[in-house]
Amino acid sequence: ALPISLKQVDQDYIRILERTKQQITEFHKNQIDKSWSLYKDNGVIMGQMVRPIERVALYVPGGTAAYPSTVLMNAIPAKLAGVKDLVIITPVKADGKVNPVIVAAAKVSGVDTIYKFGGAQGVAAIANGTETIEKVDKIVGPGNIFVATAKKLSYGVVDIDMVAGPSEIGRASCRER
């Protein structure tokens, strides 16, 4: 069980999370692959077997801001695809707790466990496993340059989604003369 009751978070916010979950689910349910096979007269069997990834970690940046959208947009498709054990790794706030907004999004999304650690060291721990942390099969989610580098270095030990990091936004304008 996750370490928070949804009663600890504003109920209007919970309704927003639930509505967002419905919208994300509606979109992603159309992307679910299914196993199939063809049996030919000559005895040949052709097809595709689709099996979900067993255990996936979702990195959720924590630092100074909360990113519940990262939870929703990664956890809901994973659960729809059949991921059996979905865990979050995220840095804690200064008080040693995970932001309640992140925990609420995790509960709404069906996340199984939240680990209270992050950074490159968190990626290394979840990729390789420790005495107390079971390794995962895949790591997804954005992070800073250190997290992105740790994911890149972990590729091959575990699968990763991509080397995702901070977004850069620029604006260009031209003045006619």
What spans do the regions from the language model cover?
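Mid-sequence acidic-hydrophobic segments that form the walls
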Residues: 20-34, 59, 77, 81, ...
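Conserved NAD(P)+-binding/catalytic subdomain of aldehyde/semialdehyde dehydrogenases
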Residues: 110-175
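N-terminal Rossmann-like NAD(P)+-binding subdomain of aldehyde/semialdehyde dehydrogenases
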Residues: 1-54
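Short, small-residue-biased leader/transition segments that mark boundaries at the very start
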Residues: 2, 176-177
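Conserved small-residue-rich beta-alpha loop and adjacent elements
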Residues: 38-104
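Active-site-proximal helix-loop elements at catalytic-domain edges
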Residues: 100-114
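Generic structural signal for well-ordered, non-membrane alpha-helical segments
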Residues: 6, 10-24, 49, 64, ...
